[in-house]
Amino acid sequence: MNRHHEQQQGQQKRLLIIDDEPDLTIICSLALEYYGFTVDTFNDSEEALSNFKPDYYDLVILDIKMPKMDGFELYDELKKKDNDVKVCFLTASELYYEEFRKKEYHALDKRLFIRKPIDNEDLLKEVNRIMTSA
């Protein structure tokens, strides 16, 4: 796949990244913007929730472990505002995601997570995979 094709992939797609690590949100947003996505970021879950625009984002990427409100709580609140929004989780611990999913979020696909740390090519691949999944 050439770079021009990769840059066109994200055109017209809007992403929201919510993670309490500012460096991570900057790196991810720059990488995804390079590939043509429009990206908004927040480093605070409550601020993200209050600024969330229903029917606007094609994909929301949430960190799981955040202060104030964790990613699963934020997921619930976002779904109340926009039940159709696609959400995936960003986590350093696949095991933590899987345990929590089995315990309280059975309906979540076990593949709706992106593992930290991640390089730009893997990030693009995972975002495209999740966005095209049913």
For each of these PLM feature ranges, what is it?
Residues M1-R14, D119-A134:
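Non-catalytic signal-transmission and effector/linker regions of two-component phosphorelay proteins
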Residues D19, D63:
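Active-site residues of response regulator receiver
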Residues P22-D40, L108:
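Two-component/phosphorelay signaling modules centered on CheY-like receiver
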Residues T41-L59:
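Acidic, metal-coordinating helix/loop segments flanking the phosphotransfer/catalytic sites
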Residues M66:
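Receiver (REC) domain active-site loop signature in two-component systems and cognate sites
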Residues E73, E94-R115, E121, K125:
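Alpha4 helix (beta4-alpha4-beta5 surface) of REC/receiver domains from two-component response regulators
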Residues L90-A92:
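Hydrophobic/aromatic residues positioned on beta-strands within the core alpha/beta folds
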